[in-house]
Each structure stands twice: as C-alpha cells, then as structure tokens.
C-alpha cells in the first residue's frame, strides 16, 4: 500500500497530501492582508461573472435544442470561471469556506476565518457588479435581437422563485461540487491537471441548476438592471411586457436568493467537504 501511495504521489498528491495542501492554502488565505484578499476577491468575482456571460451566450435562442444537451454545454463552458480563479490564485468565497479545515486544525482563529470570508465575499460582489455594469454599457443585452437579454431575465427570475429552503439546499449541493472540484485540483501537479479535473464537477452543478452565491451576484443584478433600465426598443424586439419581470428587485435578490444560497454554500463547502474530508484523511 505504501508503495502504491508513493507511486501515486509522483504524479499527483495522495488524499492525505491533498488535505495538507488544503490546510496550508487555508492558512495562507486567512493570514493574508485584508486589502489583498479583497482585491483577490474582486478578481474572482469578475472571473465567475465572465463565465456566466459565456453560459448565457450558449443558452440564448436555444429553444429548439434538447434541454439536457443545452444545459450540459452551459455547464462545461461555465467551468472556465472556476478554472480561471484557481489558476490565477484569486479568492472565491465558495472555495474560501474551506478555510474551516485550518480552523479545525488549530492553525487559524475563528476571527481570522470569518474576516477572510467577509472580505472575500465583498470583493466577489464588487467584481460581479463591475462586470454587470460593463456588460450593460456594452449593449450586450441587445445581442441576437435582444434574445441574450431575455435569457438573462428568464434565468434571473427563475433564481428568485425558489422557496427559501429550496435555495438553501441548492446552495449546499452547489458548493459540494465546487469544493470537490477545488479539492481535487489540489492533487494536480500541473496546470493541465488542475484545469481538467475541475471541468466535470463544475459542469455538474451548473447543468443541474444548483445555486452559487457569487454567480448570482452577477446574474441577478444583471437581470434587475435589464428589467428596469432597458429601452422600449428592447422590449419591442423581444415582444415581452416589462411588467412580467417587475419582481426582479433587491428584496427578492437578497432575501429570497442571496441569503439562503450563501448559507447553503457555507454548509456545503465548509462542512460537507472541508471538515468531512479532513476527518477522513487526518484521523487515520
């Protein structure tokens, strides 16, 4: 068994080594200066937002395509966002929930962990809103005769109509897959290893419609902007009454989606993957 682990370790980290790597990474993140964490969070938020732009393009005017196939394509292209975050070394709130492994290991304090979560969360929000603003002013919502903007509206509205408990559980499922992807990337020793291993777990959560709080920091504000600031020409092109999307507002965004999804993401990442995986590898 030892020789098998040694052979594996030459091409990839063993589960125990990956857990050590996760703990070291979590410790580094928690000890980073808050301003750097915030700026790194902006970068990650922008990466995820751009990935959702890519996703939206693949879903636009796709009514004639098989539903599952369309979602699969959307999930696969969205994985680019998490790949960019990991390769660039940016900080994403959902994967930063894994800092709980360093807290459980006694290497950081609860204050350090919570501070990192808050700073990165705010940075992610700024990054997502920045891309939303740039996309809006670029006129991208008018692409494909306004169908691109209609996809944004439909996707955003769907997200705010989960029940609170549904959104919470969709958040758990999402961050189980995100943190599985990131944790598996810790085992890779090359950029190709790390990128390739994350594609399918991320594709799974997106194609299945699980909820990611940072992605929603772009998608739902983008929907709100499109619903309330689009020109009459936009609505004429898509042939839809603007009142259909009047419920896209801050209340529905924050209360009905962002809060329960964020809490679910914490449970899915910090506990279901971080603490559980550490227990599996560190206690034997």
Curated annotation (Swiss-Prot):
Topology class, membrane: Multi-pass membrane protein
Organism: Haemophilus influenzae (strain ATCC 51907 / DSM 11121 / KW20 / Rd)
Protein name from the UniProt record: Formate channel FocA
Sample GO molecular function, one term: formate transmembrane transporter activity
GO cellular component, one term: plasma membrane
Cytoplasmic side: 1-34, 94-116, 185-194, 274-284
UniProt subunit comment: Homopentamer.
Alphabetized UniProt keyword annotations: Cell inner membrane, Cell membrane, Membrane, Transmembrane, Transmembrane helix, Transport
Lineage of the organism: Bacteria, Pseudomonadati, Pseudomonadota, Gammaproteobacteria, Pasteurellales
Gene: focA
Topological domain spans for side Periplasmic: 56-72, 138-163, 216-252
Similarity remark: Belongs to the FNT transporter (TC 1.A.16) family.
């Amino acid at each position: 068994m030892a020789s098998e682990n040694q052979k594996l370790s030459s091409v990839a980290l063993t589960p125990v080594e990956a857990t050590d790597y996760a703990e070291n990474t979590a410790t580094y993140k928690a000890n980073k200066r808050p301003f750097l964490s915030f700026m790194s969070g902006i970068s990650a938020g922008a990466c995820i937002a751009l990935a959702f732009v890519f996703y939206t393009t693949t879903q636009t005017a796709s009514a004639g395509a098989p539903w599952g196939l369309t979602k699969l394509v959307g999930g696969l292209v969205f994985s680019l966002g998490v790949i960019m975050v990991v390769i660039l070394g940016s900080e994403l709130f959902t994967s930063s929930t894994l800092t709980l492994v360093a807290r459980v290991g006694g290497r950081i304090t609860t204050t350090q962990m919570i501070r990192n979560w808050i700073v990165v969360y705010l940075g992610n929000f700024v990054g997502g809103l920045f891309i939303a603003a740039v996309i809006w002013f670029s006129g991208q919502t008018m692409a494909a005769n306004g169908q691109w903007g209609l996809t944004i509206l439909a996707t955003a509205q769907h997200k705010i109509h989960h029940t609170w408990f549904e959104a919470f559980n969709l958040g758990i499922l999402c961050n189980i897959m995100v943190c599985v992807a990131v944790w598996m990337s810790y085992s890779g020793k090359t950029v190709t290893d790390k990128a390739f291993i994350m594609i399918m777990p991320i594709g799974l959560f997106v194609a299945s419609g699980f909820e990611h709080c940072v992605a929603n920091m772009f998608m739902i504000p983008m929907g709100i902007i499109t619903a309330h600031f689009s020109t009459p020409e936009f609505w004429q092109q898509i042939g839809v009454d603007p009142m259909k999307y009047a419920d896209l507002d801050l209340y529905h965004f924050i209360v009905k989606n962002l809060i329960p999804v964020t809490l679910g993401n914490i449970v899915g990442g910090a506990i279901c993957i971080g603490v559980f995986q550490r227990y599996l590898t560190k206690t034997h």
